[in-house]
Amino acid sequence: RGYSGSGEKMSAIALDNQLDGSVDTGAINHRLLVGIDYQDRSNHTTGYYGAFPPIDAFNPVYGAQPDYITLYSREKHKLRQTGYYLQDQMSWDRWRFTLGGRYDRVSVSNIDKLHDSRSDLDKNNVSTRAALLYLFDNGVAPYLSYSTAFTPTSFADENGNVLEPMKGKQWEAGVKYEPLGGNSQFSAAVYRINQTNIATKEEPTDPYRSIGEIESKGVELEAISHLSDSVRLQAAYTYTDIRYKKSSPQEQGKRAVYAPRNQASAWLSYDVKSGLLEGLTLGSGIRYVNGVTSDRLNTHTLPSYTLVDMVVGYDLSSIGLNGLSAQLNVNNLTDKRYVAACNSLSYCYFGAERSIVGSVSWAF
């Protein structure tokens, strides 16, 4: 029997400051957004592995001491990132055109305390976004968009070198439909995403490595309908085919781990508009997940699962506390036990058990 464990302590600060406004140039209206964001993150990680004596599954004897437990990793990761971004959303007649850009400056360091080594990486990058949409008289709005992405990581490879940031590009085409005089919205989209330098590892004790490229292709469908002033129904479905496009020969063309092939959800909510319970919101929904592969060679497919969630919210404005609201979220209401994902045939992970989260917010 094997054992692996890890610990992490993280401190972080993040700031995002933005300014938006509107200006006209002739017949074109410009909705402008400009901003600066900053994050400074530091985390300390430790990793252990070990071995325990065998156990008889039919006549188990508990309480055995480990043969050994070894500290194999003790690292400090630091990441500092500053981003400057600008977006112009233009409106002319029935056309909508969006252009955006972002410039990032990133500094990353990985300090290996076990081997007394350090690796640093400094990068600058420009990301872009463009989208085009046309509004027809009948409520149909086709659109096309393209964007690039840049995500730094503080993970290091087997030689202690910080991995290159993940880069990606996405094409998306779709159509939105809002029936005239109705209270419903429908959308359908197809997309393709290509990502490079994806950080991954097979076993918990393995070092990280970069996958050359992963390609995702999929379809997304969504429907939102206000059945009445109080009742709202939302349903969605996503089909995704994610494969290793540039990787090791064994993985080439295989489906990626962690990625469901099919996901579907439905959510029904009810708002109390009058009476003693005015301001109360009740909601419940289901999530279905199917087609997660067991490993990078696609040996097996994990069993599908369905989860039930619930929410109770209360807008305290109805009792004179303007802007104040409280909410209780329950995820995995039935406390279903299921396998959510696998790194390999040797390491799989159960999904999150029932969780109950309460929150209070104040808008002013």
Residue ranges and their predicted role:
Residues 9-13, 78-82, 122-126, 167-171, ...:
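Residues that define the transmembrane beta-barrel architecture of outer-membrane proteins
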Residues 20, 24-28, 92-95, 135-139, ...:
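Outer-membrane beta-barrel channels and translocator barrels
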Residues 94, 192, 210-295:
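Gram-negative outer-membrane beta-barrel transporters
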Residues 15-21, 84-90, 130-134, 173-177, ...:
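Residues on the lipid-exposed face of transmembrane beta-strands in outer-membrane beta-barrel proteins
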Residues 1, 45-74, 119, 200-201, ...:
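Surface-exposed loop/turn segments flanking beta-strands in extracellular/periplasmic regions
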Residues 10, 25-33, 37-40, 75-195, ...:
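Structural signature of Gram-negative outer-membrane beta-barrels, strongest in the C-terminal barrel
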Residues 31-32, 171, 257-364:
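Conserved C-terminal beta-signal and adjacent last beta-strands/turns
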Residues 44-51, 109-117, 153-161, 197-206, ...:
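Outer-membrane beta-barrel translocator domains and adjoining extracellular loop/strand segments
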